[in-house]
Amino acid sequence: MSGLIQAAKSLLLLEFVDAFFLAMRQFFSPKPTINYPYEKGFVSHRFRGEHALRRYPNGEERCIACKLCEAICPAQAITIEAGPRRNDGTRRTVRYDIDMVKCIYCGFCQEACPVEAIVEGPNFEFATEMREELYYDKEKLLLNGDRWEREIARNILMDAPYR
């Protein structure tokens, strides 16, 4: 009996008709892709993108040269040189370099920082033509922090209940 039913389905081309209607249903459904350079997709507040050094609202850099980020980095992509202690007993960095070629974007540096100085910001479009441009120094990191501070602060605030 099942052979007879199978022969009838084949004769009436039911599989073809089912496939045709499935294709038509998908053809008129909304497209799942976006037109990337002109449209941006959703980026989570936990996204780990381009690194940035943050400043306090008074303009002073946050990094206290504790070197925890350098110690915890599994790729050894961070190099820090601390300056001499200032009159108030605090230290600041003289050199803060990140080799973005080595970085694996794990976020350990951000988690280890006690003053939220080093963060991975929301920027994911930092492709370059020269490899040397992926060696970030302190000035480049501070510029990134200044450029993305509003979004970085919002992302940290949104993630605060889970820390």
Curated annotation (Swiss-Prot):
Record note on cofactor: Binds 2 [4Fe-4S] clusters per subunit.
Signal peptide segment: none
Any one annotated GO CC term: plasma membrane
GO biological process, one term: aerobic respiration
Listed cofactors: [4Fe-4S] cluster
Sequence ranges assigned to domain 4Fe-4S ferredoxin-type in this UniProt record: 53-83, 94-123
Keyword set, alphabetical order: 4Fe-4S, Cell inner membrane, Cell membrane, Iron, Iron-sulfur, Membrane, Metal-binding, NAD, Quinone, Repeat, Translocase, Ubiquinone
Enzyme class: translocase
Catalytic activity: a quinone + NADH + 5 H(+)(in) = a quinol + NAD(+) + 4 H(+)(out)
Annotated residues for binding of [4Fe-4S] cluster 2: 73, 103, 106, 109
Membrane topology: Peripheral membrane protein
Localization per record: Cell inner membrane
Any Pfam family hit: Fer4_7
Broad class of the protein's primary localization: membrane
MF terms in GO: 4 iron, 4 sulfur cluster binding; iron ion binding; NADH:ubiquinone reductase (non-electrogenic) activity; quinone binding
Gene3D superfamilies the record matches: 3.30.70.3270
Chain residues that bind [4Fe-4S] cluster 1: 63, 66, 69, 113
EC number: 7.1.1.-
NCBIfam families recorded: NuoI, PRK05888.1-4, PRK05888.1-5
Task of the protein: NDH-1 shuttles electrons from NADH, via FMN and iron-sulfur (Fe-S) centers, to quinones in the respiratory chain. The immediate electron acceptor for the enzyme in this species is believed to be ubiquinone. Couples the redox reaction to proton translocation (for every two electrons transferred, four hydrogen ions are translocated across the cytoplasmic membrane), and thus conserves the redox energy in a proton gradient.
Quaternary structure note: NDH-1 is composed of 14 different subunits. Subunits NuoA, H, J, K, L, M, N constitute the membrane sector of the complex.
Family affiliation: Belongs to the complex I 23 kDa subunit family.
Protein name listed in UniProt: NADH-quinone oxidoreductase subunit I
